[in-house]
């Protein structure tokens, strides 16, 4: 949420990029996929957004170290973790996700040079045919947030 109650153009662009990654990531979490495969796919979503924002280049991606992809410069943490008896519950990195599992989806973009960081977090329940957004009632669009901040 912007402290001033209104996004600058740059804040809005970065916020919307994070929101697109979050929404894309939510559709990827489904029964049968492993967290490892999921994180690779989310990395691809984030890479596209960071290129579009001018934060990394296609050349950097082509020459990246697979152990530390180019997107890690601005998105250095994981995208999701299990939620259960504990906030960061235990789960298996290589085992397929199952219906009934609950996960966070929490992408972020951090631009140290601009003193700008945006992270969104959502919680979802995996179902047999998709997911239930456990935080679907919370406004996420930039315009909705600005309207809420205006009171």
Cite the ranges covered by each PLM segment.
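Active-site neighborhoods and metal-handling regions in enzymes and metal-associated proteins
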Residues: 1-151
